[in-house]
């Protein structure tokens, strides 16, 4: 024994070392891996992450990337699925507050699933406004939605005898309504604890004063509502979400339990009561209002109450209480009323909110819709006409103002306050309000007078930026600038020819229509252009004044005729060479031959021209445009003179005749060549 103890005592450290190695081996065992967080957990951490949770910005960004990848799972999902998650999150964010939290607790996985849940909850909230009270046993029990299936399976059964209705209940509701003698009232309480809609009602009284246990059923509906609300708040969120989902799922198939409540006695009693039904309904609507703050809608109910006696018993309906009237006649949601802190009463909302809250009430709905005409509070002091808003009244009063200013006494026509109508009114009464002090000419508008006065002052405030030329009117400047830009905004719809000015287009269209609006009063001959008419009228004037009585000298056909014989020379004379012209524009064009001015420049090649027509003819070289088409053979030409020369080949016209031998030619150049044969 001693020898065995010797070595054991001599090697205590070895034993310790063996024990340490054994402990070390235990410590080196790989710990079990932590479970990977779910996508929802990563999503919540991603949204709740704060900058202060990380030691630095780089770590914060890295943590956010990690949480985002844990939420979206790009290695498992496609781009479309990730986009669906982002859209789903934004959709859940913009939902109304009353259903947002409920949908988020159900955690829909796709947008379609979220839309389905929202639609079901909207139907649920709509049905809550159509609750019916069950007065069969003396206590008003509000039954709105079917109960969850889990509670029905775990608790004893209870028996309900469904009343015959037009629609049959769904399979889940039929299972609950299956007659079984083993169900008691305890199952009713257990099912009621999971109904989500009961938590929407505002609790009343002090919950702490009520000492109730899970086995004690409240005696009144008020105690039941407070007890259910308290238990619902302490319930597990997962069970609460599951209960809501089951309620919504069965709600769509079954409708509401109000159609399955044994209410034959109640309905028969209501039919026997007759007129009293409507009286109670109207009284119920009145009691929902605060007498301290009367609203305009009260008169609607009072007026309808007087006409109740004419309603037949067949058209009556069971009395319906508003949600919350079973609990001291209090509105059930903040949208229908708010609590007055001073006296502890719920104030009645405005009239429009009351009408919205009465949508599900058949008896009150007809009363509300009886008088829905908009009120007209804006009265015209002149004619007494009434309007619903102030803007319509102001628009109407402008008619009276226009009648005062613009009533035409002679023709009885009324014009508005627009300057165009005022000027039109002046033409009716012959008024010329604006008179020129220089020549005495009158104008109906001040702008016309200002434009006319520039002819006396010579003012030309509108200057061309390209060539520096000035004009008295802005319209003339715009017309002039087209010579530089080459713009031709006016196009003939018949042949497609384009023009720089609208007047040229109108003149051209007369070729297609054959219109000749200018007619000579002497002989009745018509012309397509006013200039042609002026030239023609000079022939009649020359016949009356030829020969002149003062000098006895006649005028040949080639000399221009002067309507004013006081000046026997042309009105516009060139100061350089003495040549005279009948029009100022011809003199201006002639003076460019002396000055060498070429204001018209080609924007493509830079070549300058003294006349605009030469520039237009030149630009067709660059564009290749041939706007003049022969109607006989379809050939096109860049110049009108070429088309005229070409048309003579079809018509055989020879306008150029030799005075020596009488031979005719189609071109002037050929006549000139022929005349050289006579002169040698």
UniProtKB/Swiss-Prot annotation:
Post-translational modification: Ubiquitinated, leading to proteasomal degradation.
Quaternary structure, from the entry: Interacts with a number of proteins involved in chromatin modification and transcriptional corepression including DNMT1, DNMT3A, HDAC2, PHF8, TRIM28/KAP1, SETDB1, EZH2, UHRF1, CBX3/HP1-gamma, and CBX5/HP1-alpha; recruits these proteins to the SIX3 promoter region, leading to SIX3 transcriptional repression. Interacts with MAPK3/ERK1 and MAPK1/ERK2.
Annotated positions of the Phosphoserine modification: 168, 180
Region (Disordered): 147-191
GO biological process: negative regulation of transcription by RNA polymerase II; positive regulation of transcription by RNA polymerase II
One GO location term (cellular component): nucleus
Family: Belongs to the krueppel C2H2-type zinc-finger protein family.
Listed SMART domains: KRAB, SCAN, ZnF_C2H2
Annotated keywords: DNA-binding, Isopeptide bond, Metal-binding, Nucleus, Phosphoprotein, Repeat, Transcription, Transcription regulation, Ubl conjugation, Zinc, Zinc-finger
Primary residence: nucleus
PROSITE patterns: SCAN_BOX, ZINC_FINGER_C2H2_1, ZINC_FINGER_C2H2_2
Chain intervals annotated as zinc finger (C2H2-type): 378-400, 434-456, 462-484, 490-512, 518-540, 572-594, 600-622, 628-650, 656-678
Species this protein is from: Mus musculus
Gene from which this protein is expressed: Znf263
UniProt note on tissues of expression: Expressed in Purkinje cells in the brain (at protein level).
The protein's name in its UniProt record: Zinc finger protein 263
Function: Transcription factor that binds to the consensus sequence 5'-TCCTCCC-3' and acts as a transcriptional repressor. Binds to the promoter region of SIX3 and recruits other proteins involved in chromatin modification and transcriptional corepression, resulting in methylation of the promoter and transcriptional repression. Acts as a transcriptional repressor of HS3ST1 and HS3ST3A1 via binding to gene promoter regions.
One MF term in the entry's GO annotations: DNA-binding transcription repressor activity, RNA polymerase II-specific
Cross-link (Glycyl lysine isopeptide (Lys-Gly) (interchain with G-Cter in SUMO2)): 19, 159, 286, 300, 376, 570, 579
KW Nucleus (keyword) present: yes
Residue ranges annotated for the SCAN box domain, each copy included: 43-125
UniProt xrefs under Pfam families: KRAB, SCAN, zf-C2H2, zf-H2C2_2
């Amino acid at each position: 024994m001693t020898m065995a103890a010797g070595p054991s005592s001599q090697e205590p450290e070895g034993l310790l070392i063996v024990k340490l190695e054994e402990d070390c081996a235990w410590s080196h065992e790989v710990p079990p891996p932590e479970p990977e967080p779910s996508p929802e957990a990563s999503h919540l951490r991603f949204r709740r992450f704060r900058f202060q949770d990380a030691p630095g910005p780089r770590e914060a960004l890295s943590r956010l990337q990690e949480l985002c990848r844990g939420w979206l799972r790009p290695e498992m999902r496609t781009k479309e699925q990730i986009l669906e998650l982002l859209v789903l999150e934004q959709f859940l964010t913009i939902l109304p507050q009353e259903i947002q939290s409920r949908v988020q607790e159900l955690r829909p996985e796709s947008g379609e699933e979220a839309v389905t849940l929202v639609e079901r909850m909207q139907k649920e909230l709509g049905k809550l406004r159509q609750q019916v009270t069950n007065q069969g046993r003396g206590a008003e029990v509000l039954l709105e939605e079917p109960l969850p299936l889990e509670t029905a399976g775990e608790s004893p059964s209870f028996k309900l005898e469904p009343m015959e209705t037009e629609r049959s209940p769904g399979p889940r509701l039929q299972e609950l309504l299956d007659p079984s003698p083993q169900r008691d009232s305890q199952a009713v309480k257990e099912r009621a604890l999971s109904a989500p809609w009961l938590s929407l009602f505002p609790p009343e009284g002090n919950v702490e004063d009520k000492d109730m246990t899970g086995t004690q059923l409240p005696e009144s509906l008020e105690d039941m509502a407070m007890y259910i609300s308290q238990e619902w708040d302490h319930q597990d969120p997962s069970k609460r979400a599951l209960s809501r989902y089951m309620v919504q799922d069965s709600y769509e198939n079954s409708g509401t339990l109000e159609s399955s409540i044994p209410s034959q006695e109640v309905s028969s009693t209501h039919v026997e009561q007759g007129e009293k039904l409507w009286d109670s309904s109207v009284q119920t609507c009145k009691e929902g209002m605060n007498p301290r703050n009367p609203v305009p809608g009260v008169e609607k109910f009072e007026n309808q109450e007087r006409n109740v006696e004419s309603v037949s018993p067949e058209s009556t309906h069971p009395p319906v209480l508003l949600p919350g009237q079973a609990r001291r006649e209090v509105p059930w949601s903040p949208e229908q009323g708010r609590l007055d802190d001073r006296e502890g009463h719920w104030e009645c909302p405005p009239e429009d909110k009351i009408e919205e809250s009465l949508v599900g009430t058949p008896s009150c709905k007809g009363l509300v819709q009886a008088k829905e005409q908009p009120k007209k509070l804006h009265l015209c002091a002149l004619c007494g006409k009434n309007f619903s808003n102030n803007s319509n009244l102001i628009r109407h009063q402008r008619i009276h103002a226009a009648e005062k200013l613009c009533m035409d006494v002679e023709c009885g026509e009324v014009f508005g306050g627009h300057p165009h109508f005022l000027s039109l009114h002046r033409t009716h009464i012959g008024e010329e309000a604006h008179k020129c002090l220089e020549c005495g000419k009158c104008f109906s508008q001040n702008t016309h007078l200002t434009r006319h006065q520039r002819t006396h002052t010579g003012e030309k405030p509108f200057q061309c930026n390209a060539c520096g030329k000035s004009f008295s009117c802005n319209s003339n400047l715009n017309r002039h600038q087209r010579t530089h830009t080459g713009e031709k905004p006016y196009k003939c719809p018949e042949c497609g020819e384009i023009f720089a000015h609208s007047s040229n287009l109108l003149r051209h269209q007369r070729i297609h229509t054959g219109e000749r609006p200018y007619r000579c009063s002497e002989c009745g001959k018509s012309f397509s252009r006013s200039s042609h008419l002026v030239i023609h009228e000079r022939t009649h004037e020359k016949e009356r004044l030829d020969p002149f009585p003062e000098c006895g000298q006649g005028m040949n056909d080639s000399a221009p005729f002067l309507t004013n014989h006081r000046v026997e020379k042309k009105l516009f004379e060139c100061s350089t060479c003495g040549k005279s012209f009948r029009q100022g524009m011809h003199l201006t064009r002639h003076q460019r031959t002396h000055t060498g001015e070429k204001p018209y420049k080609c924007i493509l090649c830079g070549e300058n021209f003294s006349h605009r027509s030469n520039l237009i003819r030149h630009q067709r070289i660059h564009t290749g445009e041939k706007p003049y088409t022969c109607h006989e053979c379809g050939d096109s030409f860049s110049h009108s003179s070429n088309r005229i020369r070409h048309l003579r080949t079809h018509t055989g016209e020879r306008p150029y005749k030799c005075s020596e031998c009488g031979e005719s030619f189609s071109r002037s150049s050929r006549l000139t060549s022929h005349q050289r044969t006579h002169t040698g």
